[in-house]
Regions:
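Short beta-to-alpha transition helix within the HATPase_c
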Residues: 3-11, 15, 28-44, 101
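Conserved short strand/loop->alpha-helix "switch" segment adjacent to the catalytic nucleotide/phosphoryl-transfer site
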Residues: 26-29, 47-80, 84-95
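Short beta-strand/loop element within the Bergerat-fold HATPase_c
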Residues: 93-105
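Glycine-rich nucleotide-binding loop
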Residues: 95, 117, 151-158
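Short C-terminal beta-strand
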Residues: 99, 154-165
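Glycine-rich/acidic phosphate-handling loop/turn and adjacent ATP-lid/helix
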Residues: 107-132
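Detector for a conserved hydrophobic position within an alpha-helical segment of the HATPase_c
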Residues: 139-140
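Glycine-rich ATP-binding loops of the HATPase_c
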Residues: 143-151
Length: 169
């Protein structure tokens, strides 16, 4: 699994570059295209005949600088890979939702599922996996805030990036 996770991370960065090269502006990426392509790639990689996992994507069509789009895509990659690997154990179906929206000057990424969720002893931030470490590092890099919620069934991750603040150097 380590190798397939690494491949997914590299593909995530590759999608940003592919999306950039399809436009005439090489410094920003269309988030809707990027997020949809990334989600479809991960869905294809984890699709099995034993499970029917629905993945819905609702992403706004704004542009983002490449140096912010890459970490955002890597966060989404880690969340989706973890969801496919852990949320639907011993289940033959499930739902994953990815929403990317603007609220005032904030870009908000929400990834939720109706899987098995976390127990209180499995608080996501306390898990010392490579994927969780990557997520926390990238959230810090984006100067964002994150929140995991789980009520025993399903998990929701929210990332808020203040675009006004993140543009200040």
């Amino acid at each position: 699994h380590v190798l397939s996770d690494a491949i997914a991370r590299v593909k995530s960065m590759g999608f940003v570059h592919e999306t950039l090269y399809q436009t005439e502006n090489f410094s920003t990426v269309n988030l809707q295209d990027y997020i949809e392509r990334l989600c479809n790639s991960i869905k294809s990689a984890y699709k099995t005949s034993e499970q029917e996992i629905e993945l819905s994507v609702d992403a706004i069509g704004c542009n983002m600088e490449m140096e912010k789009a890459i970490p955002l895509g890597l966060i989404l990659n880690e969340l989706l890979v973890n969801t496919y690997k852990h949320a639907f154990i011993d289940r033959d179906h499930g739902n994953i939702s990815v929403i990317l929206r603007m609220e005032e000057q904030n870009l908000i990424l929400e990834v939720s599922d109706d899987g098995i969720g976390f127990s209180e002893s499995e608080e996501p931030k306390a898990i010392k996996s490579l994927g969780m470490t990557i997520i926390q590092t990238l959230v810090t890099q984006l100067r964002g805030t994150q929140e995991f919620t789980s009520m025993g069934q399903g998990t929701k991750f929210s990332l808020i990036i203040d675009l006004d603040y993140s543009q200040e150097k």
